[in-house]
Amino acid sequence: MIDTKTAIEKITNGEFDNLFTDIYIDSSMIDYQKKRYVHAIEQYETIYCPDKVAIFSAPGRSEVCGNHTDHQHGMVLATSINLDTIAVSAKNNNDVVRFVSDGYDMITLDINDLEVNNDEAGTTVSLIRGVLRGLKDHGYKIGGFNAYATSDVLVGAGLSSSAAFEVVVGTIISGLYNDMKINSVEIAQISQYAENVFFKKPCGLMDQMACSVGGMVNIDFKDPTKPIVKKVPTEFEKYDYSLCIVDTKGDHVDLTDDYAMIPSEMKKVANFLGEDYLRDCDSNEFYIHLDEIREAVGDRPVLRAIHFFNEEHNVKNAVSSLENGKFVEFLDAIRKSGNSSFKLSLIHISEPTRH
């Protein structure tokens, strides 16, 4: 914990510059981040009062390979990015969470009321309530806190703004009440629970895991209760490459129902083959019975199942290529993944926008 005035002084005079470089990598971002953090602390002081606070960060994520495989217990390759949600926070002396996100009204939540409220589906308060409930059910201590948060993770742009928010809430509770002892995998699982059960979006676990664990990670969800997480070495600069985030001005905020159709249709194929998830299906059996499956469930579910089976190979190839320094082969796996994802995407293809 650090006094807000002291934090501002130390940030301003450069005492945390090395820490900012560790977090954001790009040295050209440091001045911006220093101003951003100072502004967040000042907003906290204005809304609440000068206090001893902790400052938490949770990054957005980019899927690298393994599109729509996580909800079928498949494999993914994902990375955190240097756009993040930060929260200035401190305990308060009651059982109330007071949470202000930049540009929004204060959310007030009684931590003794952590039941699912269907009227809150799709709202920020549902995510906070769900994370708190999940942490409590896992035996962790929870309590009231004040927080001010600001985010550079674009909403509805495929960078997992909701996952970053869930993870930062979980990390606040870990830091303020549990000595930062809640591991990143468990925070991710609890965050997914909040989004599935309270927010009512049937997402897989990739988003939360990438945001919580950080870095480039290969995640195997064959047993989603015990996902296998492996850090993957990346030296993009060695090949004069960078991962760039482009704001296309499109969004998927209103596509939850369309999104939900993807796991639903994939499961139809899995069910035909006697399983609950495609990961447990034999791809050879799938192709042997292809005509029967098409007749039973339709063409789009079949195409999405083909995508899943191919995508599992793409992930393996991408990871192996990075581990063995075969960058051209890595790019080839990414292109194959993107091509398949594009062809089997939602009906509503984003139109180019002019600004």
Feature names for model-found ranges:
Residues 1-61, 86, 90, 94-121, ...:
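C-terminal nucleotide
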Residues 132-154:
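Glycine- and acidic-rich phosphate- and metal-coordinating loops
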Residues 80-82, 159-179:
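DPxDG-like acidic metal-binding loop motif
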Residues 75-94, 213:
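Structural signature of FAD isoalloxazine-binding scaffolds in flavoprotein oxidoreductases
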Residues 137-145, 173-187:
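Phosphate-handling active-site elements
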Residues 58-73, 152-169:
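Glycine/serine-rich anion-binding loops at beta->alpha junctions
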Residues 179-227, 232, 334-337, 341:
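Alpha/beta catalytic cores of group-transfer enzymes, especially the acyltransferase/condensing modules
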